[in-house]
Amino acid sequence: HSANVAALAATAVTQLGGRTLVLTTTLKAMRAIAQALTVHFAKSGALNAKGGSEMGGIEVLLQGQWPKRRLMERFRQGGTEGQRGCVLVASASFWEGFDVPGKALQLVIIDKLPFPPPNDPLVQARTHRLELQGLNPFNDYFVPEAAIALKQGSGRLIRQTSDHGVLVVCDVRLVTKGYGRRIVGALPPMRRLNSEDEWKLALADLPK
């Protein structure tokens, strides 16, 4: 799955010249996607040993590479003239508190629905408590929490009324599972893209 997400991101990043945030639900996926993107742009000649090229190119940024504030500053610069375009791959804390208004961020890609981790002791305790109350932990806890987290992640895209962008959620459960409609319903109003061609046209229509 991570390889497919990276391939989709590489296509979009190339078209947009960066301007992309990839949010993952696990650190393992984050590292795999960042590595795949780095290899892709190195092979395409868009990267050098320092992570970018002097003649444009793409710089792949990774959560933990620098402090969060420095990553945000570098990402913002990626949308300005004379600076390499950036794609940032991140997880955890970057689902909220990542504020990049304007054209520097035009695409957010989310690898999977952000359900709470079932092996987390706090999640297990919450699940047990709901079961004792006769409730369904998945419907009454996991789905609402995923909806909230997805809304937070998608909120990285539009920070002011003049912003334009595209959100991609790489999880078929949004359309194949009944709870997918509940999660989509929690997102801000946006036009839905129903094909790859529509997606590419939407990217092409974004302000340069």
Can you name each region flagged by the protein language model?
Residues 1-208:
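ASCE RecA-like P-loop NTPase motor cores
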